[in-house]
Amino acid sequence: MKNLFVLFLIFCASFCFAQKEDLRKAIKEESINGALDFSKMLEEKYSSAPFIRFGNTLYNKKDFAILLWGAKVKNLGIESLDETIKLWEEIHNKKLTTPESKALKVGFKTKFE
């Protein structure tokens, strides 16, 4: 019985890991020119506006797209801010700047309904 329980735990852990890897892969695929690329939508919707107000802060379109990406990734199931930052940097092959990092953190912590 004890061995069966251990095998069950190992199976559950490997299944959860596989699901998380599938999620990361899907996020990577959709983040550039896909459903998680908010830059085109923002450019179309706010073409004449240089900045977008969110709360008491003005964001340029690039940073606001990162904010929306952070919120969506959290909503999809990535629970760690550090993992989200690392994932964004892997996708874009560069480190986040300070304003980009702040926008990502705000998006990650914001609950959209």
Model-derived segments and spans:
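Glycine-rich short-loop/terminal segments
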Residues: 16-71, 75-83
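Active-site or metal-binding loop neighborhoods of secreted/extracellular toxin and effector enzymes
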Residues: 80-113
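Sec-dependent N-terminal signal peptides
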Residues: 4-13
